Amino acid sequence: AYTVTLYLQG
């Protein structure tokens, strides 16, 4: 999931 990736990157 793309949005989750951005969330984990901070």
From Swiss-Prot:
Tagged with keyword Nucleotide-binding: no
BP GO terms, sorted: polysaccharide catabolic process
UniProt keyword list: Carbohydrate metabolism, Glycosidase, Hydrolase, Polysaccharide degradation
Activity-pH behavior: Optimum pH is 4.5.
Reaction(s) this enzyme catalyzes, per UniProt: Endohydrolysis of (1->6)-alpha-D-glucosidic linkages in dextran
EC number: 3.2.1.11
GO molecular function: dextranase activity
Temperature dependence: Optimum temperature is 35 degrees Celsius.
Misc: On the 2D-gel the determined pI of this protein is: 4.5, its MW is: 158 kDa.
Protein name as annotated: Dextranase
Lineage, top ranks: Bacteria, Bacillati, Bacillota, Bacilli, Bacillales
